[in-house]
Structure formats: C-alpha cells, structure tokens
Amino acid sequence: MQGSHFVGTSIAILPGFGATNCSIDTSQVPCPIATFPQLAEKQRASHFTRNWHTFGAVQNVSPVGRLAPRWTHSAHSRYPIRVKRKREVFDNLAVFAHFSAVLDSLYPLFRAGLFQLDAETAHHLSLSSLRAAEKTGVLSLTCPQDAYASPVEVMGLKFPNKVGLAAGLDKEGNTIDALGRLGFGFVEIGTITPRPQAGNPKPRLFRLIPHEAIINRMGFNNPGIEAGVANVKASRKFSGVIGFNIGKNKDTPNENAADDYLICLRAAYPVADYVAVNLSSPNTPGLRDLQGAEASARLLELLKKEQEKLAAEHGKKVPLLFKVAPDLEEQHIADLARVFVDGGLDGVIATNTTLDRHAVAGHAYAAEAGGLSGKPVLEKSTRVLASFAHHLGGKAALIGVGGISSVEDAKAKIAAGADLVQIYTSFIYQGPKLVRELAEAL
C-alpha cells in the first residue's frame, strides 16, 4: 500500500494535549496493514465471523463509517455473499491503521507542545479538539466505531471490550462520542453533583512528569446533573457502556449526603448504563468519612431501595457501584466488603487517587494538596483491589483502576480480580495508542 498525502488538516485526538494545524506527508510513515498483524487478525475474526447487531445498526462499509458489513444473499446460495465485503473491510482497516500510525508518531510532539501550557488549559483544549475532530470526521479515519471489540458481559451489561475511561476526564459528558472513537469500551463521566459547582481555586491540577503522575484537587467542578444528562442524551454514536459517577455538592453536609446521591441517581437512571457513587475523592471535605462501614451501609440501603423503585418504573436495572480509596487498611476493606455483599451492591471501583506521597517524595509538586494518580499508585491500588476480590468472593463486580500504564499492568489488575479496567492518567501521557494496546490484549 502506497503512502498517501494528508495535508493541512487539524489533527485533534490528543487527550490532555490538544491539537495543532500541520502538514503531514504520510508517505514517509510505513503503514501497510502488514505492519499491524495482531490488529489485522483480530479484525478478521471480529468483523468477518460475528454479526454486529449487538453494538449498533448494521450498515454498509465506508472508509469513514462503522465496520459493520451488510450481508447480501444470492438466489443461487443460502449463504451470504461475503467475499467483497470482507475485502472492503480489510482494505479499510489498512486506511485506519495508516492514520493511526501517523498520529501515534506525532503524539510526542503534540504532547511536548501542550505540556508547555497550564495543565487545566491543556485539558480543556484537548477535549474541545476531540469534539471537533469527531464532528468533522477526522476521528473516523483513525478508529472505526467498535474496531477494538472483544465483548464481555459484566453486571448484565455488554461491554465492547474491557477497557474504560475513568471518571475525571470528561466531567460534563460532552465528549463521549469522540472518546468512544479512540477505542474505549466504556466511558465514565463525572463526577457530577446535583447542582453546578466551580470546584476548588486554581491552580488545582499538576503534572509530575518524571513519575507519569498527576496531582489534582479539582473539587468536583461540573455543570450539574441536569446538564450532564442532557449531554449524554446527545451522545448518539457511542455504542459502548456509559457510566455516571455521582457525588455530593461541597456545601452539602454529610448527614444530608444521601439526598444528593438520590437526586443524581434519579436523574441519571433513564440514560445511564451504570451509576458509580464517589465516596473516595480526597478533594471534598469529609467525603471519605462516608466510606465508614456504618455510613456506607446506611447510604447503600437508601440507594438500593431507590434503585428497585426506578427499575420498576423504567423497566431496566441500572447497576450501582461504589468507588473506594486506595488508602484503606485491610480491616476496613473487610468491613466494607461485608457491607457491600449484605447490601446487594452490584460492583466496586478500586480505586480512586491516593494521599500517599512516598513514591513521589522530592518532586516539586509532592507537597501539593490533592489526590495522586498515575504510575505511583499502581501497587497500592492493586493491593486494595485484590483484597476486595478476596472478601467479596465474586458477589460483586470489580473494576480495577489506578496506575495502569501498560498491558502488563492491566493484566495484573485482571489477575487481582478485576472484571474490567479503567485508565486516565496514562491516557494523558501515552495517548490513544495505549487504549488500542489494552483492548487488543485483554
């Protein structure tokens, strides 16, 4: 396959890094499909032997459309005529792989440029660029919808693959379609609270580049649950699973926290595939107190009763999960696991960010208040995950998140008991290539 020329186009698929206008001579980038044997073989299996009605409407193949061939039948045979469609799909995969390789090769350059900006400015620029790239069709050249599919069923939900985006990147739920194009099997938006809130004063987001880590003290800045629901309703192209991560407003006292969670649960229920209750952010004063066994039991009881009512009202069950901190001791984990099993919790997300700074001691930002995420939290987070897996005994689903930056890390989470995994910080540092690698490997 000869290289093509892709000139003067705005390339904008850079989480945390933004976009730039540039001229690219892709003929200098080796991109035949043979360069991607694992991808090619996986796509042969997934798209040539499986019907894609599960994840979206079946339609004709096009270079910028979903890889979902419409089978036609011959009057002379009871079998579908697939040869032409197979060839079209395979040729399109070469195009997609070509553009993906171009962007992967440019990624370090984009990252270096965006890392010159304030972290939060780069964050917003990146999300707006992603949305623009999705609307203009640029993303469809790099990743066809459902291209990295290895379906798995968890909590009664069908996930296109095991790799999700953790809460915190898309706080408003307005970038879901674009993120889905990058290969995520599920996207968790938020944290979202009942009322809009601005969050903590800036600066509140810090990169610890040598450690591939981030410290944030954002403070649940979000547009409020009504806006979040409206944004999700507008996301019509993503065929994966959408989770709502919900929290309480900063000015809501803990004794009234259940009211905030109930407001969010009711509002999100019609459009959410699952709802995650954030009890573990270190950036809302007193929030982690809700992780106490008694407080969690009371909250879970109220939420489960509401879940049952909403399930009857809407004719579907939306799984309920709790997101926990990595800074839990073994006895605390055992107590919480007992509460979760007794209360019928559907799943646990392990874990949130850590307050521990030992792994980044000496860095200029180590003393900044907030939660630490990225590579330094891997060991601590995986320990908590494994402990929950032991105490839950398979009676609740587990999503492993925290420090995943490679296929080996993700497999370690699965080995520790995770049914699914999520990434965030490593996505900022490594880009969409990591999503594809994880989705193909798990």
Report each predicted region and the residues it spans.
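Residue-level detector of structural "landmarks"
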Residues: 32-38, 75
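Alpha-helix-loop-beta-strand connector modules within alpha/beta enzyme cores
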Residues: 213, 223-226, 230-239, 293-314, ...
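Glycine/Thr-rich beta-alpha phosphate-binding loop at enzyme active sites
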Residues: 131-133, 138-145, 282-295, 338-394, ...
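Catalytic cores of alpha/beta
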Residues: 174-179, 330-340, 405-421
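Glycine-rich phosphate-binding active-site loops on the catalytic face of alpha/beta enzymes
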Residues: 188-194, 349-354, 410-437
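Active-site glycine- and acidic-residue-rich loops that bind
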Residues: 249-261, 289-295, 321-341
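C-terminal helical cap(s) of enzyme catalytic domains, especially alpha/beta-barrels
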Residues: 199-212, 359-370, 427-442
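A gly/proline- and charged-residue-enriched helix-loop-helix capping module
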Residues: 190-240
